[in-house]
Amino acid sequence: INSVMDRLDGIENVDMVIGGPPCQGFSVAGKMDVNDKRSQLIWSYVKVISKVKPKAFIMENVKALGLLEKWKPIREKLLSELRHLGYTVNFMILNASDYDVPQARERIFVVGIKGNCNNVPNWEEMIKHYSHKAPTVREALQVLDKAGHGNNPSTCRAKITLASNPILRKSPYAGMLFNGLGRPTRIDGYSATLPASMGGNKTPIIDEKELYENCAPWIVTYHDEIMKDPSKAAFKEAPSFLRRMTVEEAAILQTFPIEYEFCGSQSSKYTQIGNAVPCNMAKAVATRVINVLNGEENVIFKPTEHNLFDFSYAES
């Protein structure tokens, strides 16, 4: 990224910069190493802001950066530097399930508006206007065919085996009941956060009988059984109706359009999906920033042909 910084010099009249600097160095799912090179990229983001001086910016990152005491000095320095550049900065933690995303995924958003914006309402309250009750996993996946067929063509063949020494929690959807990091998916609720590490035995698990035949979730029965008698846990293959979540299913749970195409290997596709900000969540935040820039509640924003997304929304 340092090699392209000079190309930003002289760019003017930028409306908005949107980005999510790589977060593995801050994530509880990663090594949480402040010296991780990827952790330094938040400062590259600040440098981009200082060079192009947009009217507004949106930065997304993992919840840990916003909450953990370990990252407090980083957090305070980040906000201080952005404010020093002349921005009114708001910092918030949002849950994707509040924004029409069938996933319990919490992330921080740092939103900055150039100049003094004391008259701007509370951001979280503003964004709640775009809040919609999310569909369940079952409801969201109804748009797809069965795994391996039609518009859901991919499959993940990583074997699913039960752990002989499971890590038990009160919920069957927490802990570690299987070998590997893939956890069972709550079909009639929200998915857990889809990680960038998906692929192989780190891919979430789907109960096909529950999803397609409305059977009771097998994992609940099994969890109850070994909670009562842990000796019943054994290393063995899981029932055949348990399988890994497909690329297409993961994309739907991140609210990508069904026709959206990902490039690269299957492993790369899982990573792209897990790293992404859920589309509906991004829309809610970006739309509100556009409102502020336009000074109006109705939004009509037509990006150029080079933009990936076309926002055209109006509040009812």
Predicted region positions:
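Short glycine-/small-residue-rich Rossmann-like dinucleotide-binding loops
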Residues: 22
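SAM cofactor-binding core of SAM-dependent methyltransferases
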Residues: 1
